[in-house]
Amino acid sequence: MQRLCAHALILVLALAAFCEASWKPHSQLQDAPVAPGANKGQEPLRMDRLGPASHPRRQLGLQDPPHMVADLSKKQGPWVEEEEAAYGWMDFGRRSAEEGDQHP
């Protein structure tokens, strides 16, 4: 019985943590843009407008999504070429089909 209670408690705590991370008030859901390009003329959605920030958000600081996307786009390096070379073997099915067509 104690084991069942412990598992139930862990489940409830895990669900509460996930619900807190994905929860938005209903009023903010109505203001959210429907499509990615729907708010082109408007100011970007800021984290500080969402209300009081949770502890993890305060630790991360306030960054606009365009800044985060720009930072990610800068992180292209020599590993991209290495990945292309490493994944070159994945087209073996196409090569096998071409080799089969060459033999009468």
Swiss-Prot record:
Listed under GO biological process in this entry are: G protein-coupled receptor signaling pathway; response to food
Q: Where is the signal peptide?
A: 1-21
Compartments it resides in: Secreted
Q: What is the designated name of this protein? A: Gastrin
One GO molecular function term of this record is:
hormone activity
Residues recorded as bearing Phosphoserine in the entry: S96
Taxonomic classification:
Eukaryota, Metazoa, Chordata, Craniata, Vertebrata
Post-translational modification (record)? Sulfation enhances proteolytic processing, and blocks peptide degradation. Levels of sulfation differ between proteolytically-cleaved gastrins and between tissues.
Q: Which Pfam families match?
A: Gastrin (PF00918)
Residues folding into a coiled coil are: none
Similarity comment text for this entry: Belongs to the gastrin/cholecystokinin family.
Q: Which UniProt keywords apply?
A: Amidation, Cleavage on pair of basic residues, Hormone, Phosphoprotein, Secreted, Signal, Sulfation
Maturation propeptide residues:
22-58, 96-104
Q: Does this UniProt record's set of keywords contain rRNA-binding?
A: no
List-wise, which residues carry Sulfotyrosine? Y87
- Spell out the InterPro entries in the cross-references: GAST, Gastrin/CCK, Gastrin/cholecystokinin_CS
Q: Which residues carry this modification: Phenylalanine amide?
A: F92
Free-text function comment from the UniProt entry: Gastrin stimulates the stomach mucosa to produce and secrete hydrochloric acid and the pancreas to secrete its digestive enzymes. It also stimulates smooth muscle contraction and increases blood circulation and water secretion in the stomach and intestine.
GO cellular component terms given for this protein? extracellular space
